[in-house]
A protein has these predicted regions:
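Short, Lys/Arg-enriched N-terminal segments with co-localized hydrophobic residues
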Residues: 1-7
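Cytosolic, long alpha-helical scaffolding segments
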Residues: 8-180
Length: 180
Protein backbone atom coordinates (compact mmCIF):
# COMPACT_ATOMS: atom_id res chain seq x y z
CA UNK A 1 0.00 0.00 0.00
CA UNK A 2 2.85 2.35 0.88
CA UNK A 3 4.55 1.62 -2.46
CA UNK A 4 1.37 2.63 -4.32
CA UNK A 5 1.46 6.04 -2.61
CA UNK A 6 5.13 6.45 -3.51
CA UNK A 7 4.40 5.51 -7.11
CA UNK A 8 1.48 7.97 -7.28
CA UNK A 9 3.60 10.74 -5.76
CA UNK A 10 6.39 9.97 -8.21
CA UNK A 11 3.93 10.01 -11.13
CA UNK A 12 2.57 13.38 -9.97
CA UNK A 13 6.07 14.83 -9.78
CA UNK A 14 6.96 13.43 -13.21
CA UNK A 15 3.94 15.17 -14.76
CA UNK A 16 5.53 18.48 -13.82
CA UNK A 17 8.75 17.64 -15.63
CA UNK A 18 7.36 15.95 -18.72
CA UNK A 19 7.21 18.21 -21.77
CA UNK A 20 3.80 19.35 -22.90
CA UNK A 21 4.94 19.67 -26.50
CA UNK A 22 1.50 18.89 -27.85
CA UNK A 23 0.18 21.94 -26.03
CA UNK A 24 2.72 24.30 -27.58
CA UNK A 25 2.45 22.87 -31.09
CA UNK A 26 -1.33 22.99 -30.97
CA UNK A 27 -1.31 26.60 -29.79
CA UNK A 28 1.20 27.66 -32.44
CA UNK A 29 -0.89 25.89 -35.08
CA UNK A 30 -4.00 27.70 -33.84
CA UNK A 31 -2.26 31.07 -34.11
CA UNK A 32 -0.95 30.19 -37.56
CA UNK A 33 -4.40 29.11 -38.76
CA UNK A 34 -5.86 32.36 -37.42
CA UNK A 35 -3.20 34.30 -39.32
CA UNK A 36 -4.11 32.43 -42.51
CA UNK A 37 -7.76 33.41 -41.99
CA UNK A 38 -6.74 37.00 -41.33
CA UNK A 39 -4.62 37.20 -44.48
CA UNK A 40 -7.44 35.72 -46.58
CA UNK A 41 -9.88 38.30 -45.22
CA UNK A 42 -7.36 41.12 -45.69
CA UNK A 43 -6.64 40.08 -49.30
CA UNK A 44 -10.36 39.80 -50.04
CA UNK A 45 -10.96 43.23 -48.47
CA UNK A 46 -8.21 44.89 -50.49
CA UNK A 47 -9.64 43.38 -53.70
CA UNK A 48 -13.19 44.47 -52.75
CA UNK A 49 -14.47 47.37 -54.90
CA UNK A 50 -17.39 48.29 -52.64
CA UNK A 51 -16.05 50.50 -49.82
CA UNK A 52 -18.74 49.44 -47.31
CA UNK A 53 -18.06 45.75 -47.92
CA UNK A 54 -14.31 46.42 -47.69
CA UNK A 55 -14.78 48.28 -44.41
CA UNK A 56 -16.82 45.40 -42.95
CA UNK A 57 -14.21 42.84 -43.97
CA UNK A 58 -11.38 44.92 -42.54
CA UNK A 59 -13.32 45.57 -39.32
CA UNK A 60 -13.81 41.82 -38.87
CA UNK A 61 -10.05 41.45 -38.48
CA UNK A 62 -10.24 43.07 -35.05
CA UNK A 63 -11.96 39.97 -33.66
CA UNK A 64 -9.29 37.74 -35.20
CA UNK A 65 -6.53 39.89 -33.71
CA UNK A 66 -8.14 39.53 -30.27
CA UNK A 67 -8.39 35.74 -30.75
CA UNK A 68 -4.68 35.65 -31.49
CA UNK A 69 -3.93 37.73 -28.40
CA UNK A 70 -5.81 35.16 -26.30
CA UNK A 71 -3.91 32.22 -27.80
CA UNK A 72 -0.59 34.04 -27.41
CA UNK A 73 -1.47 34.62 -23.76
CA UNK A 74 -2.14 30.87 -23.39
CA UNK A 75 1.31 30.16 -24.85
CA UNK A 76 2.92 32.43 -22.25
CA UNK A 77 0.91 30.77 -19.46
CA UNK A 78 2.01 27.31 -20.65
CA UNK A 79 5.59 28.54 -20.87
CA UNK A 80 5.42 29.51 -17.21
CA UNK A 81 3.76 26.22 -16.23
CA UNK A 82 6.03 23.77 -18.01
CA UNK A 83 9.49 22.95 -16.77
CA UNK A 84 10.48 21.11 -19.94
CA UNK A 85 9.52 22.53 -23.33
CA UNK A 86 9.79 21.01 -26.82
CA UNK A 87 12.42 23.60 -27.76
CA UNK A 88 14.22 26.52 -26.15
CA UNK A 89 11.99 28.69 -23.93
CA UNK A 90 13.36 31.90 -25.45
CA UNK A 91 12.62 30.58 -28.94
CA UNK A 92 9.05 29.74 -27.92
CA UNK A 93 8.63 33.24 -26.49
CA UNK A 94 10.16 34.84 -29.59
CA UNK A 95 8.02 32.79 -31.98
CA UNK A 96 4.83 33.54 -30.04
CA UNK A 97 5.65 37.26 -29.95
CA UNK A 98 6.54 37.33 -33.65
CA UNK A 99 3.33 35.57 -34.66
CA UNK A 100 1.35 37.99 -32.49
CA UNK A 101 3.15 40.88 -34.20
CA UNK A 102 1.93 39.65 -37.59
CA UNK A 103 -1.68 39.73 -36.38
CA UNK A 104 -1.09 43.19 -34.90
CA UNK A 105 0.39 44.47 -38.17
CA UNK A 106 -2.48 43.07 -40.25
CA UNK A 107 -5.01 44.68 -37.95
CA UNK A 108 -2.97 47.91 -37.91
CA UNK A 109 -2.89 48.06 -41.72
CA UNK A 110 -6.63 47.41 -41.78
CA UNK A 111 -7.29 50.24 -39.33
CA UNK A 112 -5.24 52.64 -41.45
CA UNK A 113 -7.18 51.76 -44.60
CA UNK A 114 -10.43 52.38 -42.69
CA UNK A 115 -9.33 55.46 -40.72
CA UNK A 116 -7.80 57.24 -43.70
CA UNK A 117 -10.79 56.39 -45.87
CA UNK A 118 -8.65 54.79 -48.55
CA UNK A 119 -11.06 53.87 -51.32
CA UNK A 120 -8.73 53.86 -54.31
CA UNK A 121 -6.79 50.63 -53.85
CA UNK A 122 -3.97 50.52 -56.39
CA UNK A 123 -2.22 47.51 -57.91
CA UNK A 124 0.77 47.84 -55.59
CA UNK A 125 -1.45 47.54 -52.51
CA UNK A 126 -3.17 44.51 -54.02
CA UNK A 127 0.24 43.02 -54.79
CA UNK A 128 1.26 43.56 -51.16
CA UNK A 129 -1.90 41.87 -49.90
CA UNK A 130 -1.21 38.88 -52.16
CA UNK A 131 2.42 38.68 -50.97
CA UNK A 132 1.25 38.78 -47.36
CA UNK A 133 -1.21 35.98 -48.07
CA UNK A 134 1.41 33.81 -49.78
CA UNK A 135 3.89 34.48 -46.97
CA UNK A 136 1.43 33.48 -44.28
CA UNK A 137 0.51 30.30 -46.16
CA UNK A 138 4.22 29.40 -46.25
CA UNK A 139 4.52 30.34 -42.57
CA UNK A 140 1.53 28.11 -41.82
CA UNK A 141 3.32 25.21 -43.52
CA UNK A 142 6.45 25.89 -41.45
CA UNK A 143 4.52 26.10 -38.17
CA UNK A 144 2.73 22.83 -38.86
CA UNK A 145 6.13 21.35 -39.75
CA UNK A 146 7.50 22.09 -36.28
CA UNK A 147 5.57 19.17 -34.80
CA UNK A 148 7.50 16.71 -36.97
CA UNK A 149 11.09 17.90 -36.95
CA UNK A 150 12.05 14.79 -38.91
CA UNK A 151 10.97 16.56 -42.11
CA UNK A 152 13.58 19.31 -41.96
CA UNK A 153 13.62 19.61 -45.75
CA UNK A 154 9.97 20.71 -45.91
CA UNK A 155 10.49 23.11 -43.02
CA UNK A 156 13.58 24.59 -44.68
CA UNK A 157 11.76 24.94 -48.01
CA UNK A 158 8.96 26.87 -46.29
CA UNK A 159 11.51 29.20 -44.66
CA UNK A 160 13.29 29.79 -47.98
CA UNK A 161 9.92 30.52 -49.59
CA UNK A 162 9.07 33.02 -46.85
CA UNK A 163 12.41 34.75 -47.47
CA UNK A 164 11.72 34.93 -51.21
CA UNK A 165 8.33 36.52 -50.47
CA UNK A 166 10.09 39.04 -48.24
CA UNK A 167 12.34 39.94 -51.18
CA UNK A 168 9.28 40.19 -53.43
CA UNK A 169 7.72 42.51 -50.85
CA UNK A 170 10.84 44.70 -50.84
CA UNK A 171 10.66 44.97 -54.64
CA UNK A 172 6.96 45.82 -54.45
CA UNK A 173 7.69 48.51 -51.86
CA UNK A 174 10.29 50.04 -54.20
CA UNK A 175 7.74 49.95 -57.02
CA UNK A 176 5.17 51.67 -54.81
CA UNK A 177 7.63 54.35 -53.73
CA UNK A 178 8.41 55.15 -57.37
CA UNK A 179 4.70 55.78 -57.99
CA UNK A 180 4.40 58.36 -55.21
Amino acid sequence: NYSIHIYMAFASIMKIFLPKDRVFYGLFEEVSSNLAQMSDIFTKAIAEKDSTARHNLLKSLEEWEHKNDEVTHKIFIELGRNFITPFDREDIHYLATSLDDIADYLWGASKRVMNYGIDDIDDVTQDFANIISKSIKALNKAIYGLRDMKDIRSLTEACVLINSYENEGDDTLDKGMMHL
